Amino acid sequence: GLLNDDRFYSFLNKITAFIWAYAVTNPGVNALRTPIFAEMINIVTGQPVRFSDYLFDTQKLQNAFDNYTFSNNRAITKAMLTWWAFQNSSQELLSLESVLEIEHIYARNRQEKEHSLSNPRNVESLGNKVLLEKRINIRASDYRFSDKVKYYTGFENNRKQKKEGTKIKELTDLAAKATDFTESDIVERNAKII
């Protein structure tokens, strides 16, 4: 085709990162118009996409992400979790019929009952959230990690019915390797995502 795959891939990476940075620092679609339009002109004229007139201060941007509340009703939360899931090269494409929700790996209900996280904000951080099929999230939502493992990996119930696990590779890998998901796991995973 007419597109150079490498340049297009580079453009997609840059524009995705730019949109997320803008969503955290300058919320609102209108704020994106000017910088995106300028870079579209660069694409049309064959110039590299750099967003050079709209660079972010690294430390200020990191602080903005650290202080941002990634609530489940914000579009950026699900977008970043989707992007993160597909950074795993082993992640298979999901059916378009799959209804995905946001799962708290360390259950909110557990935190409300036990108050065991030293920083209560960690329960709502990206490091504690993952995409999960709705059919599984309903059953797994309030359990300890060790109890959630069977829902993540699949199991046979008392009536000998096979209950399929998640197709989210990161969760199946985590369920296979870990016996618990702790605050340090939340913090470490959050740093990787952001």
What are these regions (language model features)?
Residues 5-13, 74-75, 96-99, 120-127, ...:
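Conserved structured core elements
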Residues 5-8, 24, 28, 92-95, ...:
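Extended hydrophobic-aromatic, low-complexity segments
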Residues 1-78, 173:
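A cross-family structural signal marking well-folded subdomains
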Residues 20-27, 48, 73, 89-93, ...:
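Residue-level signal for secondary-structure boundary elements
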Residues 93-125:
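Histidine-centered nuclease catalytic patch
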Residues 75-101:
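Short cysteine-rich loop/turn motifs with clustered Cys
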Residues 123-125, 129-194:
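Long, cytosolic, alpha-helical-rich C-terminal regions that act as interaction/scaffolding modules
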Residues 19, 106-110, 130-137:
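Short, flexible loop/turn elements at secondary-structure junctions
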